[in-house]
From Swiss-Prot:
One of its GO terms (biological process) is translation. One of two assembly initiator proteins, it binds directly to the 5'-end of the 23S rRNA, where it nucleates assembly of the 50S subunit. One of the proteins that surrounds the polypeptide exit tunnel on the outside of the subunit. Belongs to the universal ribosomal protein uL24 family. Keywords: Ribonucleoprotein, Ribosomal protein, RNA-binding, rRNA-binding. This is Large ribosomal subunit protein uL24. It holds the Pfam family KOW.
Length: 103
């Protein structure tokens, strides 16, 4: 079971966007895409055949998973994730600071 999943609320702990809070949109190997953060400018050449207008656009770049931590809304801080099995035998993730389950 992964400690960080899609749609998790995370906080960036290193890099130019340090301290920013966002939602994970996609996880690829050991990288995460965070909605609206770690933006880079991409120069797009116009292509009338495909209907693409040229210009400078901003795209989200992946962050290393080691530079993000899950955000705990009750403590309003970065937190660590633990994995435990419930009495039903189902694995669940929980915050290590206050032992609450992650929804």
């Amino acid at each position: 079971m992964q400690k960080i999943k899609s749609n998790d609320e995370i906080i960036i702990i290193a890099g130019k966007d340090k301290g920013s809070i966002g939602i994970v949109t996609k996880i690829v190997d050991s990288k995460v895409l965070v909605e609206g953060l770690n933006l880079a400018k991409k120069h797009v050449k116009p292509n009338p055949n495909k209907g693409v207008t040229g210009g400078i656009t901003e795209i989200e770049m992946p962050l290393s998973i080691s530079n993000v931590a899950i955000y705990n809304p009750t403590t309003k801080k970065a937190d660590r994730v633990g994995i435990r099995t419930s009495k039903n035998g189902i694995k669940e993730r929980f915050f290590k600071s206050n032992d609450k389950s992650i929804i």
